[in-house]
Amino acid sequence: PIELHGGNQRLLNPAIDKQTIRVQLGRRTCTVCERESPYLRCHHRALDAHGEAKAGETCGGRTQAKETKSNAYRRGEVQSVRMDEMVEDARIRLGIDRLPAQVKCTKKLNSRDQTPEAIEKGILRARHSLPVFRDGTVRYDMSDVPITHFRPREIGVPWKKLHGLGYTHDYRGRPLEDDEQTLEIFPQDFIVAKGAADFLLRTAKYIDELLVRFYKMEPYYNADKADDLIGHLICALAPHTSGGVLSRIIGWADCSGGYAHPLFHAAKRRNCDGDEDAIMLLMDGLLNFSRDILPANRGGQMDAPLVLTTRLNPTEVDKEALNVDSAWFYERDFYEATLQQPHPKDIQNRMDFVERRLGSVAAVRGYGFTHDCFAIDRGPALSAYKTLETMIDKMNGQLALGHRLRGVNVRQVASSVVRSHFLPDLRGNLNAYGRQKVRCLKCAHSYRRMPLSGTCIQPKKETGRGLSSMGVAKAEGGLCNGNLALTVSEGAVRKYIEVMRFVMDHYGVDLYTRQNADWLASSADSLFNNDRAKQLSLSDFL
């Protein structure tokens, strides 16, 4: 953490220029030199026999947390950190010539003990241009796509390599000898989006460099190209959950989605209706994830792999995945029964669902399919919602499709979109604009009400040598005086008004929806537009 010493971009170099900074960190004591250090390993420079310290040679002893503020929400205390010496020691220990141009830091730690991550990890991540999640891991998001069968050609992996991963026979039981044979995917195998190949490769190189330079161990991945990651383990994690699922990379798909078994997606608590989940290299999670750096506020334990499911159990997943049809064909009496339009439960005994296979190997193997395809990734690489730029283009695309479908009433679709999307968004943005805070562009302090001075009135904290380096505010004067900015802009409120009027004028909506939309639009106009009041004299009324 560097507070405001790194500027708006929270960069490490500006904080180094200030040499000593004042930040809130947990208090720990070294068991070797008995000096205080916020890190798990003492960062102070070791002294030789003559009492002199040398750059790059640190104590490195284990530290123990001090018993302070045991009942506090966050147990850290404000203390001084010599940034220039600490970063220089880290650079020398890593054996690199210079720091990356941009090393991102955080303003403050939200964890309970406020124990910082080793600064060497942030430096190495910046060398490979990798982002970091709040739990210390590097993740890549992709849409969930279910799959049961594939061909080696479709995932860009030779059949001989898949043979070494356990795919010895195709779905008909014949030995695997060709790239065109159809294979049934194992429940915990994963086909990654090709766009993630370079990202995962950079992550693997970062992990290897971390093992060699920081942990003084042998590299693990030794990956020179993306195909070298085939067969390595990953951890898949869905948002708003705290349990990862173990998986294995077996290939690449030319799309923006990740292909996996339906039971695998269900184990992540997902049903493949457009959700996006994250994957991370397993070694990254084992090395860098820590509960000690998770936020202590509400929801801080979510989106973190607190537990890892190593073996998928079909009886423990959501029932929605157990309703997957796994038959090879539909019998004649099924088609005849559909003529009477019965309730699905009345004919479910005629269907081969996964639920009926529980308790046997057939629950995870031997799934069937009724239609084959040439390539699993032959569909659109990106959805139209991403390729179409403006919201008007997106609405035209949706309603143009409604014109082609006889069972769709375009006017009802337009009314539904306006009622369920545009109007609630406009109403919520109007409320947010009226209740917003103002934020200082200099020190990032926020106010519920605008100060009468029109500028930031927080005491200014000088940095440098002496007492000022401790962040001591001046006794008199010395206010921040930074410019204040709104946190909710006019554009955020009015962004859908033009689109909403376009939909109502071109496709038509019911009268109630139009009146509601006009009323909210006029409310926005009265909030932002100047009424241009004129000063009148008495003669104007004669």
Model segments located where?
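Conserved core architecture of multi-subunit DNA-directed RNA polymerases
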Residues: 1-542
